[in-house]
């Protein structure tokens, strides 16, 4: 999951990481804390029956795209400029190839067989520049298929509980998308059946951005939508009733949006340790069929 915003890296303390929500002292505030916007975090058992966070950042490099000589894109922007001969179109940060990511697919039981077949046979591509042969992915392993269980967490009345966004959250209200803190808190409180009131001495940590994409069939661009960023953290006071460990609200649930993790404060205090993790690597598979098809097309066109 994207690293929650309560996890920070202390720039003036050799990059040490901590969960500032459970820090009793405030000395860390003077060590230039930085949120880890590009990092991923996962919970794991360190062998002492105590859960902790492992945080890892993917390797990034910059890709530069230039126009092909003689094409329309290679023409000078205006007659007064002498640009040409491979004019640069744009550049973008890209994740290194070969990294292994994991996730969970939730579907109705009767469709599980079809979903598994699709995952195994489909050509998976994510992100931008699909036409430039980037972001090709292959399925490495399906670790297991099991029934979805919804755990309930016991809470005490007035106990602070934290809602951590595991994915971006898009919420509509009266026909428009909203991102203001009060409206988002109202939507989350209604789903959890708790008060919108902020517990004393607590605060939210949230960010917003704009999301977009393309239609699967015709590759038409979807409208851009403002959304609350994954990793945002909201705090509420429990009503004393059991709460689910995970909820999903908002728009685009079929695309994995709006997944929220619920943590009572006593559980949050157990997650004081934050350690450096890693992202597994594998040699990217060579797209032999794609290379052969491109070669044939180039040969014919020549």
Which residues does each predicted region cover?
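Conserved active-site/ligand-binding neighborhood in enzyme cores
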Residues: 1-302
